[in-house]
Regions:
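Juxta-kinase regulatory segment immediately upstream of eukaryotic protein kinase catalytic domains
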Residues: 1-13
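ATP-binding glycine-rich phosphate-binding loop
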Residues: 15-35
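ATP-binding pocket architecture of kinase catalytic cores
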Residues: 33-35, 39-156, 161-162
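A glycine-centered beta->alpha junction motif in the catalytic cores
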Residues: 50-59, 104-119, 165-175, 239, ...
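An alpha-helical support segment within catalytic cores of ATP-dependent transferases
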Residues: 142-153, 158, 163-203, 268-270
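Active-site activation/catalytic loop segments of kinase-like enzymes and analogous catalytic loops
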Residues: 165-174, 232-267, 281-298, 310-318
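ATP/Mg2+ or Mg2+-diphosphate-binding catalytic cores
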Residues: 289-345
Length: 345
């Protein structure tokens, strides 16, 4: 790591290292404090350490990169594409030759959630800016033939079904009625077909209030390495429903923000609301399954502590969707809902 920093700033001294909170991935983050060096040497930089070249779980499931995996880090590949279309990404200062580490611009410690919930903050304005940025990014991020990995994978019927199965396998009590589970699978298969028929655009995939930072009055976007093609409202649903976000984004504010996005993106508001509900329901079911998987299989109990917020969101969207009575009932009677712990938030 020291050699990686010195390659970028030969005259700088490493004055200190401190851990930075990460997320569900195999990546770890450190903040390096730097002294001296050339005029372009920042006071701090972020060091990302990777256990492997890692791609998203479903990317592996779809085998889009073949048995040997991607040729380069997806983070670097997607960054190269996006950085020509927005200045919201952190700069990549250096990447290790073996792809086990990279040095990034430090975009601070203020996720969008903290900015929106700070005393005196205007949540509608904060989240609205994030939606404006998203709409602009979607409008500019067309495939240019440069080899961006996002255009090699998409939320198609197969992937939607895979994520629904992930929910059934890990999010529901295995002792639930076999008949109810069979009907749930049939309902979600039909929903996967509806979702797969929607037009697809460039999608961050985890565009939520902890992957957006407010840094020196600018919104900065991180964790974009799992980008793919998906319905346009998927990232909107991610932003407005992830984790504890519905504590802040009530139905009235949600409706206002969806209208703002629709106007900025140039899509009919009624179509945006319908697609939003479908995407939000699919995504929150995936999250219920994923958080249980992370807690039970990967040994990360903090994710189980978020489920008491996530499960009510799943029930709310189940009530908005036609044709899912068995799924709706299982969300009431057989879902694994975790236990609350404020420290996990």
């Amino acid at each position: 790591m020291r050699s990686l920093l010195s390659q970028r700033w030969p005259d700088a001294q490493l004055a200190g290292l401190e851990g930075v909170r990460g997320d569900a991935s195999s990546r770890r983050y450190l903040r390096a404090r730097l002294d001296g060096g050339a005029s372009d040497c920042p006071e701090t930089a972020i060091v990302m350490l990777m256990e492997d070249a890692g791609v998203a779980l479903s990317s592996d499931e779809l085998s889009v990169f073949g048995d040997d995996g991607p040729r380069e880090l997806p983070f670097v590949n997607v960054w190269r594409f996006l950085s020509t279309r927005t200045d919201a990404l952190p700069e990549i200062y250096r990447v290790a030759d073996d792809s086990t580490a990279m040095v990034l611009e430090d975009v601070g410690d203020t996720p969008l959630w903290d900015a929106a919930t700070a005393p005196g903050a205007d949540p509608e304005a904060v989240f609205g800016r994030a939606l404006d940025l998203l709409a602009d990014l979607q409008a500019s991020a067309a495939d240019d033939g440069s080899g961006c990995y996002a255009f090699k994978q998409s939320f198609d019927e197969r992937l939607f079904r895979w994520e629904f199965e992930h929910f059934i396998e890990y999010g529901l009590d295995p002792e639930a009625s076999a008949g109810a589970l069979t009907e749930c699978r049939a309902e979600l298969a039909r929903l996967a077909d509806r979702l797969a028929a929607l037009p697809r655009v460039f999608c961050h995939r985890d565009y939520h209030a902890w992957n957006l930072h407010l840094h020196r009055s600018r919104i900065r976007v991180i964790d974009f390495q799992d980008a793919l093609l998906a319905p346009a409202l998927y990232d909107v649903a991610s932003l407005l429903t992830d984790r504890i976000t519905p504590r802040l984004i009530d139905p009235s504010l949600e409706a206002s923000l969806i209208t703002r996005y629709a106007q900025h993106a140039g899509v009919p508001a009624d179509r945006a609301r319908e697609e939003y509900n479908l995407c939000a329901f699919q995504r929150v079911l995936k999250v219920v399954g994923r958080f249980n998987f992370l807690a039970e299989v990967k040994g990360k109990p903090a994710y189980a502590a978020m489920l008491p917020d996530v499960v009510p969101t799943a029930r709310e969207f189940a009530a908005r969707i036609d044709g899912v009575p068995a799924t709706r009932e299982l969300l009431q009677s057989a879902v694994k809902a975790g236990q609350a712990r404020e420290a996990a938030l």
